[in-house]
């Protein structure tokens, strides 16, 4: 490889022609041993160390492997390593890593991408760019245009092996060596991800007419394959469900786990959307005396196969009606004050117009048609009164305990006495008072008897 004689940093030799005009030479490439000289003129790259870490792009871009001959720039060392026969083309290494049969599975290496960066939009853009580049490189297509066939579902590695791994139609003699060689080096995403991504049943593949002059759609066992037009003939389908074209162009194929064709998406949408909503009616009613809103949804669900028969379509038609009353109630413990009484005023008018009745028969509907706001106010007043009475009862009980404590001589000066202590001491004090009362009553009886005796003596002394 030729080396450049000019370099911005002292003591640095550029061996890569791609990095000849770079202001700072990167230090993470294989020729990093000869970057610096040991002479006294060499300076350590301490001031540029942070700039060197910014040279490599993040995330690293995949090297362009397919069109090395059309590019005007000289190939980089990564491309040369990927295209090196001694490093990647040995059959011993392919057998050791299990990559020997990947050449038949991947006819075109341009479609294969890294698993981390793959996507439907990137695939479509890449296929479009490849087809345009092939048309510009090979010339205008002779007949037809690019066609896509409906995908035959997600194919597992076992299914691919059953369908014939060697059935990938490749015209190696018509393609350049630069395009045909990296196909054996690419890794099929199906090997990395053995499980299918889209689990769909295989759709029946229509047979290509034998009298078609243009190239028919190339059908892959994994997914939709974009085949560039211009092939003179179409080979008969192989047991693996794969057709190959005998012209100069390859079928741009992708694995079933990675991509889906547009026609397959349309078929899946038709299968998924078996039922569609025909009628959606939204009705909102508001009563004059009530702020409650009732929303009525009428949904008619009619299947797509209604054209099979009128009786079957009528039997399968389904009408769903649902009323959604919107209640705004903040107190969840109280009973719901919302009563369906919106139709009460019309009934009351009909009754009053049909046959006039006394006032007593009209009063009950009025009591039923009270607004929720009035009922809420009544409930709040009732709860407020209950709270006031309960608070008053607790205050009276506390004051009675304090009074009882003041009457017990042992607890007069004890302000922190508990209610249980107050009750016990008060009971003992009452028992002592009762005993004292009994003694006093006995003494009173004795005194009364003594008084009677003295009165009798006084009367006897007067009579004598």
Swiss-Prot record:
GO biological process, one term: branching morphogenesis of an epithelial tube
Compositionally biased region (Low complexity): 149-159, 208-233
Motif 9aaTAD per UniProt: ranges: 76-84
Impact upon substituting residue 36 to A: Reduces interaction with AURKA
Subunit structure: Efficient DNA binding requires dimerization with another bHLH protein. Binds DNA as a heterodimer with MAX. Interacts with KDM5A, KDM5B and HUWE1. Interacts with MYCNOS. Interacts with AURKA; interaction is phospho-independent and triggers AURKA activation; AURKA competes with FBXW7 for binding to unphosphorylated MYCN but not for binding to unphosphorylated MYCN. Interacts with FBXW7; FBXW7 competes with AURKA for binding to unphosphorylated MYCN but not for binding to phosphorylated MYCN.
Keywords: Activator, Disease variant, DNA-binding, Nucleus, Phosphoprotein, Proto-oncogene, Transcription, Transcription regulation
Protein name in UniProt: N-myc proto-oncogene protein
Residues with PTM Phosphothreonine: 58
SUPFAM superfamilies in the record: HLH, helix-loop-helix DNA-binding domain
Major subcellular location class: nucleus
GO CC aspect terms: chromatin; nucleolus; nucleoplasm; nucleus
PANTHER family per UniProt: MYC PROTO-ONCOGENE
Region Leucine-zipper, residue ranges: 433-454
CDD domains: bHLHzip_N-Myc_like
Pfam families per record: HLH, Myc_N
Superkingdom of the organism of origin: Eukaryota
């Amino acid at each position: 490889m030729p080396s450049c004689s000019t370099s911005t940093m002292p003591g640095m030799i550029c061996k890569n022609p791609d990095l000849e005009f770079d202001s700072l030479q990167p230090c993470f490439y294989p020729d990093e041993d000869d970057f610096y000289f040991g002479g006294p003129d060499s300076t350590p790259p301490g001031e540029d160390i942070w700039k060197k870490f910014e040279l490599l792009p993040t995330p690293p871009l995949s090297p362009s492997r397919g069109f090395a001959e059309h590019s005007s720039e000289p190939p980089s060392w990564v491309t040369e390593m990927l295209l090196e026969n001694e490093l990647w083309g040995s059959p011993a290494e392919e057998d050791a890593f299990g990559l020997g049969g990947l050449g038949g599975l991947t006819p075109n290496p341009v479609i294969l991408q890294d698993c981390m960066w793959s996507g439907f939009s990137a695939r479509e853009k890449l296929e479009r760019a490849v087809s345009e580049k092939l048309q510009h490189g090979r010339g205008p297509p002779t007949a037809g245009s690019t066609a896509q066939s409906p995908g035959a579902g997600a194919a597992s590695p076992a299914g691919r092996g059953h369908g014939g791994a060697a059935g990938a139609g490749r015209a190696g003699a018509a393609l350049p060596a630069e395009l045909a060689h990296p196909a054996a080096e690419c890794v099929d995403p199906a090997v990395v991800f053995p499980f299918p991504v889209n689990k769909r049943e295989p759709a029946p593949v229509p047979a290509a007419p034998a009298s078609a002059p243009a190239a028919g759609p190339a059908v892959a066992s994994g997914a939709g394959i974009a085949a560039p037009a211009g092939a003179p003939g179409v080979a008969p389908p192989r047991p693996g469900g794969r057709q190959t074209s005998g012209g100069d162009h390859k079928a741009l194929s992708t694995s079933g786990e990675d991509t889906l064709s547009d026609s397959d998406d349309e078929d899946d949408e038709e299968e998924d959307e078996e039922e569609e909503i025909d009628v959606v009616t939204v009705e909102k009613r508001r009563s004059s005396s009530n702020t409650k809103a009732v929303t009525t949804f009428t949904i008619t669900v009619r299947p797509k196969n209604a054209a099979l028969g009128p009786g079957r379509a009528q039997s399968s038609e389904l009408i769903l009606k649902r009323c959604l009353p919107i209640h705004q109630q903040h107190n969840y413990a109280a009973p719901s004050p919302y009563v369906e009484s919106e139709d009460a005023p019309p009934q009351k008018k009909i009754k009053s117009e049909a046959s006039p009745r006394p006032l007593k028969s009209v009063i009950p509907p009025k009591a039923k048609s009270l607004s929720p706001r009035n009922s809420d106010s009544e409930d709040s007043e009732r709860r407020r009164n209950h709270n006031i009475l309960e608070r008053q009862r607790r205050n009276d009980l506390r004051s009675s305990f304090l009074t009882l404590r003041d009457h017990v001589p042992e607890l007069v000066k004890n302000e922190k006495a508990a209610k249980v202590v107050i009750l016990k001491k008060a009971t003992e004090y009452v028992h002592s008072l009762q005993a004292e009362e009994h003694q006093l009553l006995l003494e009173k009886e004795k005194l009364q008897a003594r008084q009677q005796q003295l009165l009798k003596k006084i009367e006897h002394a007067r009579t004598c």
